[in-house]
Amino acid sequence: MLTKPSARILSFEEAAAAVERGAAFVDLRPIESYLEVHIPGSLALLYEFGPGMASRARDCLPLSLPLVLLDLGHGEPAHAAGSLRGKGFTVLGRVTDGVNEWAAAGGSPVSTEIVTQPQGRVLDVGDPGAKPGEDATRIPVDRLWARASELVDDEAITVASGYGVRAALAVGILERFGHEEVAVWQSG
């Protein structure tokens, strides 16, 4: 018998407590929406039906990282949860309208500036279509979690972006590791 995927609905307080204990918010919204406003350190995983999103998560994030899904109605969080669980992740549940709930609880959502000229260190995470240049630091997004500490915390970082999916995930990883000055450069 086939079972329908599910994701427990969490109150924002439950979700925030889980994140305080080490879980991560996963933002399922379109990349443009994520870059415009998001919870600092939340991880952008564009929801797409099929194996793409969950495979990207498996390649880029530790399986030991518990996940809390954020959605504003653009994706199907139950299917996203099922896909992520199928790759070995623990999905604690989902929060509807999480970014607004974060702000209502006194959190300060952040925006990621999209720049036309790079500022500070240029980071090439392997985003298809990006043209980061010869001087870019190359850390593929699937290695960034393990190598983010190699980057100086107080240094401005510009992530070279093509299509943006990997670049947006890199923004969240960098923020999670304490990098506050992160921009995206559409270099493609």
Feature locations, PLM:
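Cytosolic catalytic domains that perform sulfur/thiol-centered chemistry
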Residues: M1-G188
